């Protein structure tokens, strides 16, 4: 049976394999590149906002942030108004590789959209956003029963 989930999973697996290959020398894997890019494009973002933007759980975000920090690509600065929160920034090392990571991302987006009209891409994105919203609505019905 055909389903959005099956095709989404295949796209995810194939793209992750390409990302892993292209970013191997930087020691940034498919599990971290999206976190890296969001931080690069939104320096000062909080860890919570980072996870929210990527639709991932707190523990997943924490692991990715810790990995990128350990590799020297990002740093965390405590928020003055509330010491419980940290803002995330690229380090000099992170800034040095940022263009390369963004280039790989752009290259893979080009592969995704090869021979597909822009109008179809935009429509597909709108459909996928609706699917995500539907899933979030369903998840909210079970507040407290999912791990976040």
List each language-model region with its residue ranges:
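C-terminal regulatory/oligomerization modules of transcriptional regulators
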Residues: 119-148
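N-terminal leader segment of winged-helix/HTH proteins
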Residues: 1-26
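Short, locally clustered residues in the helix-turn-helix/winged-helix DNA-binding domain
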Residues: 37-41, 102
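The alpha-helix within a helix-turn-helix
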Residues: 51
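Residues within helix-turn-helix
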Residues: 47-48, 59, 66, 86
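Short alpha-helical "packing" element that flanks the helix-turn-helix/winged-helix DNA-binding module
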Residues: 32-36
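Short capping segments at the starts of secondary-structure elements
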Residues: 42-46
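Charged, amphipathic alpha-helical coiled-coil/dimerization segments
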Residues: 16, 67-126
